[in-house]
């Protein structure tokens, strides 16, 4: 059975939060639940640890297998997230960079780095869902 990683799609002011990992790929914030921790609790903790942000976890967006390395798979479970508080993200030691990427700049590569197809699919799923009125530009 593949290990589990809970990921969050955090969209704020028509931008999505991405993290650049050590493999040079864009990543969604998230990670493995601690023993006894549910998906939502794990995701809130991971976003806080990886980006210094507080979130509320929303709807399940996607589940898929991701081939991290040849023949090494991780089960990804992605949820929509809503930012609570400030939007200034700070990268942890686990990532090289955090970036709020404008939704109209999303693609298979961003700034010369690959965005895995499963993550792009989860982001597109989140975009298609209604967001909080306070998150829309006026």
Where would I find each of the regions flagged by the language model?
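C-terminal lobe/hinge of AMP-binding adenylation domains
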Residues: 21-24
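Nudix hydrolase/Nudix homology domain
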Residues: 26, 93-138
């Amino acid at each position: 059975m593949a290990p589990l990683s809970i990921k969050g799609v955090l969209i704020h002011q028509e931008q999505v939060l991405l993290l650049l990992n050590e493999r040079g790929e864009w990543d969604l914030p998230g990670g493995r639940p601690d023993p006894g921790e549910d998906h939502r609790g794990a995701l809130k903790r991971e976003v806080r640890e990886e980006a210094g942000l507080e979130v509320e976890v929303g709807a399940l967006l996607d589940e898929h297998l991701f081939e991290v390395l040849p023949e090494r798979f991780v089960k990804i479970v992605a949820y929509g997230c809503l930012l609570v508080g400030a939007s200034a993200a700070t990268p942890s030691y686990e990532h090289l960079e955090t970036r709020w990427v404008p939704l109209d700049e999303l693609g298979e590569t961003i700034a010369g780095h690959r965005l895995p197809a499963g993550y792009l699919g989860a982001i597109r799923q989140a975009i298609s869902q209604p967001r909080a009125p306070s998150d829309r530009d006026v």
